[in-house]
Amino acid sequence: MDAQLEWASSLVPKRQLQQQQQQQEQQQQQQQDFHKDQLMTVGMRIRQRVDQGYASRTPSTSDASLQPGVIRDYSSVIVPQFTRSPLPTANSLPPMLINQRTMSTEASSLEKWDVAEPAAEHEAMVNGSKRRL
């Protein structure tokens, strides 16, 4: 009987050890599953944070900048000396189209845009080479 008691008493610590190992494995598996879930949803969480950031109001934003459909002009922030050149008015005639190897003698519409000299010289060179053909 003493041998059976010793054998039974030796099983208890082994069972406890096995239970502890199983609990540790379960905890590790739960941590791994948690980390996998976190990694699988990272893209969605980033998109959500960015969306919330755009929707949040900061002190520098105005009501007009938060309204959808309002076009914001950031050109002066990106390039400080940049100013937009105005579009030509709708009252002017459109440039003539090339038809049967003839060209309009009217000046190009680029002159209306105040194009820099090198571009105008390039345009004259291109127009001259077309006339020779």
Swiss-Prot record:
Keywords: Cytoplasm, Nucleus, Phosphoprotein
Disordered, as annotated region: 1-40
Localization in the cell: Cytoplasm; Nucleus
A single cellular component GO annotation: nucleus
Disulfide partners: none
Any one of the GO BP annotations: protein localization
Coiled-coil region list: none
Principal localisation: cytoplasm
PTM comment, free text: Phosphorylated by DUN1 in response to DNA damage which leads to its degradation.
UniProt biased composition (Low complexity): 16-32
Family according to the record: Belongs to the DIF1/spd1 family.
Assembly with partners or alone: Interacts with RNR2 and RNR4.
Protein name listed in UniProt: Damage-regulated import facilitator 1
Species for this entry: Saccharomyces cerevisiae (strain RM11-1a) (Baker's yeast)
